[in-house]
Swiss-Prot record:
The organism's taxonomic lineage, starting at the top: Bacteria, Thermotogati, Thermotogota, Thermotogae, Thermotogales
Protein's name according to its UniProt entry: Small ribosomal subunit protein uS19
Entry GO MF terms: rRNA binding; structural constituent of ribosome
UniProt keyword terms in alphabetical order: Ribonucleoprotein, Ribosomal protein, RNA-binding, rRNA-binding
Function: Protein S19 forms a complex with S13 that binds strongly to the 16S ribosomal RNA.
InterPro entries assigned to the protein according to its UniProt record, in alphabetical order: Ribosomal_uS19, Ribosomal_uS19_bac-type, Ribosomal_uS19_CS, Ribosomal_uS19_SF
Gene name linked to the record: rpsS
Gene3D superfamilies linked to this entry: 30s Ribosomal Protein S19, Chain A (3.30.860.10)
A single GO BP: translation
Region Disordered, residue ranges: 76-95
UniProt feature, compositional bias: Basic and acidic residues: 82-95
Any one Pfam family match given in the protein's UniProt record, by short name: Ribosomal_S19
CC per GO annotation: cytoplasm; small ribosomal subunit
Keyword rRNA-binding applies: yes
Keyword Signal: no
Length: 95
């Protein structure tokens, strides 16, 4: 179940303040945030936001296609090591 429309999208207050300040001055700086749950709003388009994935900050450039999604969707938290090689498995079974 999603968030109620009457409440509006959740955006971290401090993150929103930083975005608005950069929009007023016209600066383009990378903004570090730990708020993965914040929704991307039209004011953020064109900015680069470094989203924390539990280990480091991943820079995410915000485009119009991302509006309505959460910041955390663009900074994966898990590493995929890959599936085991089938040839290696067969060789182990024969020995």
């Amino acid at each position: 179940m999603g968030r109620s429309r009457k409440k509006g999208p959740y955006v971290d207050r401090k993150l929103l303040e930083k975005i608005r300040k950069l929009n007023e001055t016209g600066e383009k700086k990378v903004i570090k945030t730990w708020s993965r749950a914040s929704m991307i709003i039209p004011e953020m388009v064109g900015h680069t936001i470094a989203v924390y994935n539990g280990m480091k900050h991943i820079p995410v450039y915000i485009t119009e296609n991302m509006i309505g999604h959460r910041l955390g969707e663009f900074a994966p938290t898990r590493r995929f090591g890959g599936h085991a090689d089938k040839k290696a498995k067969k060789g182990e079974l024969k020995k």
